[in-house]
Amino acid sequence: MNPNFLDFEQPIADLQAKIEELRLVGDDNALNISDEISRLQDKSHALTASIFGNLTSWQIAQLARHPRRPYTLDYLEHIFTEFEELHGDRHFTDDAAIVGGVARLDDQPVMVIGHQKGRDVREKVRRNFGMPRPEGYRKACRLMEMAERFKLPILTFIDTPGAYPGIDAEERNQSEAIAWNLRVMARLKTPIVSTVIGEGGSGGALAIGVCDRLNMLQYSTYAVISPEGCASILWRTAEKAADAAEAMGITAARLRELGIVDEVIGEPLGGAHRNPAATAESVRQTLLAQLESLRGLDADSLLEQRYERLMSYGRA
């Protein structure tokens, strides 16, 4: 099966394979088969619309983890200019699972921070599969405090299965690093806009997700635990992951209904990986609009609204 397609997209993959076969036949035999190709393309588009119009929570979770889905560095490339990455937590080391630095959004200087996974095996290992250690969160905290000093808005991109649970991370006080970030972000006197671009996994996501505006891409997820983890606890088997995903309410649409998410950013048909540039433009427009809405607030009003927003969780 084509690695660009997930299991539930198999009918679409089959049609695309037929289209590619016809293109090869046309190249080899100089036959005019454009009408048949056009018909199959229309059929593929309609089938894609049908499948993606009825996705389950578990299928959305699979899309959120798609290996070709745009990551933080992809959005940095498409949306921002003059990005200058900053490294290290000034306590232990640098953590490549979190990237951050100063950049410009249009002409506005901002601080950008986000989880970063990896494409190939070497990069996945270097980025620890997007699971930060304590030094990653301490680096993020250092950059956020720097942003406050220089009066820069903070934009965070969330995409992690969770904070790294290894022994070395626990030895360096993973829980304290996350808790400290929550405390600091709640008090920062500068606008914070967070966007879930893939997986929003538990405290590992929340550690850069305390904000004034929270966005989720249409096929992203946000939850206290993975569906597999929840199923393993409740039913003693990860095979019930689909049931767990449905019960947990992990999707952007459901979290918007609950009042946790401020805006759901639409994705191209088939998911963000089908057209990263279009997805990035949608994110850019959303960020610009939200920063504009926050620009006129003084520090006290900003903190008061942030506090009220956090306290409203669970009231919907």
Swiss-Prot record:
Residues 39-293 form the CoA carboxyltransferase C-terminal domain. It catalyses: N(6)-carboxybiotinyl-L-lysyl-[protein] + acetyl-CoA = N(6)-biotinyl-L-lysyl-[protein] + malonyl-CoA. Its main location: cytoplasm. GO terms for cellular component: acetyl-CoA carboxylase complex. Its EC number is 2.1.3.15. Acetyl-CoA carboxylase is a heterohexamer composed of biotin carboxyl carrier protein (AccB), biotin carboxylase (AccC) and two subunits each of ACCase subunit alpha (AccA) and ACCase subunit beta (AccD). NCBIfam families: accA, AccA_sub, PRK05724.1. Component of the acetyl coenzyme A carboxylase (ACC) complex. First, biotin carboxylase catalyzes the carboxylation of biotin on its carrier protein (BCCP) and then the CO(2) group is transferred by the carboxyltransferase to acetyl-CoA to form malonyl-CoA. Belongs to the AccA family. This is Acetyl-coenzyme A carboxylase carboxyl transferase subunit alpha. It comes from Azotobacter vinelandii (strain DJ / ATCC BAA-1303).
